[in-house]
């Protein structure tokens, strides 16, 4: 894949420093994956396509050239927030993940790539007490979109956006409404090379989420909103 060309088609142009940051990120991912099991994808072309490029397709849903705060819930090895931070150094990023080994890996990434304004939080999303704090909240490949909505919507500022990246989903609009949001659009596209389908939902926060949300994760999982 011609990473530079494909990003230009998204309206993203990287300088030499940013390209070097992506190269270093790839090297760290492969190195630490041997002991941490961070990803099942290690081939360089596939990492650039399915992790780096895929993360940056969020520009289809939002203008990241603005000075905004972004919270990435369940980021794993840093997707989509670290690629977004490399491409848009102006954004302030908070990453929340429940697995400490992933947070430790991301500390190394942030240090080695000289990234600033990145905060790494080891916590479960439902226990992360920053309601109505972020312009944008992202999540990638959460198994159940309704669970993702309950975990993430409380974190979004009124007039901010939740941008879940999904492959498929079964969504009731009443769930979005119950959590203070409205579905603005579904953005559907295909990854280059393999033509696999991707979807980004653009959910705007129109009113404050009720204080009772999010519930405990056991309650969320046992009885997800419908």
Feature annotation, model-predicted:
Residues 56-141, 149:
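Conserved SAM/SAH cofactor-binding pocket of Class I
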Residues 175-226:
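SAM/dcSAM-binding transferase cores
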């Amino acid at each position: 894949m011609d990473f530079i060309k494909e990003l230009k088609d998204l309206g993203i142009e990287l300088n030499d420093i940013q390209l070097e940051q992506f190269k270093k990120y790839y090297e760290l991912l492969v190195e630490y994956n041997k002991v941490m099991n961070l990803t099942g994808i290690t081939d360089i072309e596939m990492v650039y396509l399915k992790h780096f490029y895929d993360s940056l397709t969020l520009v289809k849903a939002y203008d990241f050239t603005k000075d905004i705060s972004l919270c990435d819930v369940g980021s794993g090895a840093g997707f989509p927030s670290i690629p977004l931070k490399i491409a848009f150094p102006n954004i302030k990023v908070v990453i929340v993940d429940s697995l400490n080994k992933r947070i430790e890996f991301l500390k190394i990434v942030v240090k080695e790539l000289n990234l600033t304004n990145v905060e790494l939080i080891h916590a479960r999303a439902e226990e992360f007490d920053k309601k109505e704090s972020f312009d944008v909240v992202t999540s990638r490949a959460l198994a159940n979109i309704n669970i993702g909505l309950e975990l993430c919507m409380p974190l979004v500022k009124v007039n901010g956006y939740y941008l879940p990246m999904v492959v498929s989903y079964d969504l009731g609009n009443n769930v979005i409404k119950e959590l203070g949001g409205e579905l603005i659009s579904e953005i559907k596209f295909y990854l280059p090379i393999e033509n696999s389908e991707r979807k980004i939902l653009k959910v705007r926060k129109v009113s404050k989420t009720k204080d009772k949300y999010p519930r405990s994760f056991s309650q969320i999982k046992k009885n997800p909103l419908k």
